[in-house]
Amino acid sequence: MAAGLLKGFDVRLYDKTAIVTGGAGGIGRGITRAFVKEGANVLVVDINDDAGDALAAELGEQVRYLHSDISVEANAASIVAAAVEAFGHLDVLVNNAHASRQAPLLETTGDMMDLSFSTGFYPTFWLMKAAHPHLAERDGSVINFASGAGIDGSPTQASYAAAKEAIRAISRVAANEWARDGINVNVISPLALTEGVEAYIEANPGIEKRLLSGTPMRRFGDPESDIGRVAVFLASDDASYMTGQTMMVDGGGLMLR
């Protein structure tokens, strides 16, 4: 249903526009679907054209797909401009995309660090800056992503953990600096059954039980109904008095004090 037809219905994101990076698959796709169901327009940013086009066709006129390499700094401004051109304004920035390689710390190379920071931390940083003036006009929201790998120091995850904790740090700085502009900045640390996790489980028999052994709920989250619904809350007016926080959406795997 088009966003314009949702006026008067009980939806939480009516007339809001969001950018979701890595939005064509996994958690990003789950967030996109959850946002659309709540009335939002979404610019899906990805490099998987087949998946991006399919999602846009599935969800209709509330979604536009943009092929863009977020590891190129100059693309941040064009991504924001594309969202504003398509839907007239920007309310929510979801920095979900990230790529990395696993290795023990002593085997982690500079190239591995570069990959993680160039696809995770730096695009988050660039897009936040590019989106700021538009978000400030709309009392907007930024939703960034952390990981238990960084919070808990997971072995073989040095490059990913480092970039994710850098994202948490810059999110807290932005939360302090941008509150005066009406922008809230929060972080989700998820555990979800994505395509990548499914492939990892299939390639490593018995690993699923070990992965969930420290999770009280003993299951992976669903990208849409578990992670996406929390993102809807953070993007909605219901979370307008909340900023600088990390939401652990991981079935109780990590309970921060």
Predicted regions and their residues:
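Alpha-helical segment proximal to the catalytic Tyr-Lys
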Residues: 133, 176-180, 240
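Residue(s) in the substrate-gating loop at a strand-loop-helix junction
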Residues: 147
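Active-site helix of classical SDR
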Residues: 128, 163, 171
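Substrate-binding pocket helix/loop in short-chain dehydrogenase/reductase
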Residues: 104-105, 109-117, 211
